[in-house]
Every structure is written in C-alpha cells, then in structure tokens.
C-alpha cells in the first residue's frame, strides 16, 4: 500500500534566502542518500492569509510503511529534523494511504 507523508512547517520568523536555500539543499539530498520514496516536493505557500503561520509544505510518497519508517529513522532525515527544530519550527505531519478509499477524482 502506497502512502503520502505531508509536513507543514511553521517557523517563528520567516527564513531568509540562505535559510530557504539550505532547507531545499537538505531535502534535495534525500532521493540519492535516503531513497525509498517515489515523490518529493517542497514548496513555499503563495497565500499567507490561509496558512495559519505555516510557510512551507513537504510532500513525499512512499511505497509502503516500512519505507516511511526507514526514511524517518535515516541519519540524513534526522539531521534535517534537528536543523528544523533548532530554528524553533513547529512541524505538523500527516500520513495517509494512497488507495481506493482516498481517491476522490
């Protein structure tokens, strides 16, 4: 069963250009160094009025739960998590299956 892992990031102060570039650099490492994911996207919100303070969204897909767990435990992901938390970011994560029960269109 494939699944989607989404994380919203809320930093107390907006990242400057260097901070955003570093965040993107770290995420760009994942496919080659962690593996196991079938899709990775990282984007900044284009509408701050509706985000409740979340500036970025991370979108990933995995073929199964063991691949998600391996990603979460991988040292490269742990390094990214430390980087995010050191900036007093409040991440909000949501995981759900990509199957016939979640298809709308």
Where is each model-derived feature located?
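A broadly conserved amphipathic alpha-helix scaffold signal in soluble, globular proteins
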Residues: 69, 82-85
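A general structural signal for short secondary-structure boundary/capping elements
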Residues: 85-90, 101-105
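Conserved catalytic core of Hanks-type protein kinase domains
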Residues: 61-62, 87
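Short S/T/G/P-rich N-terminal loop/turn motif that feeds into the first structured element of a domain
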Residues: 1-54, 63-73, 96-105
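A common structural junction motif
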Residues: 29-31, 76-81, 88
């Amino acid at each position: 069963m494939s699944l989607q892992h989404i994380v919203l990031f809320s930093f107390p102060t907006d990242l400057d250009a260097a901070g955003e570039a570093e965040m993107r650099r770290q995420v760009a490492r994942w496919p080659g160094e962690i593996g196991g994911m079938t899709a990775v996207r990282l984007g900044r919100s284009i509408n701050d009025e509706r985000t409740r303070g979340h500036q970025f969204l991370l979108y990933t897909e995995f073929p199964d739960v063991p691949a998600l767990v391996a990603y979460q435990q991988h040292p490269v992901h742990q390094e990214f998590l430390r980087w995010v938390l050191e900036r007093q970011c409040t991440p909000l994560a949501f995981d759900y299956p990509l199957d016939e029960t979640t298809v709308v269109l």
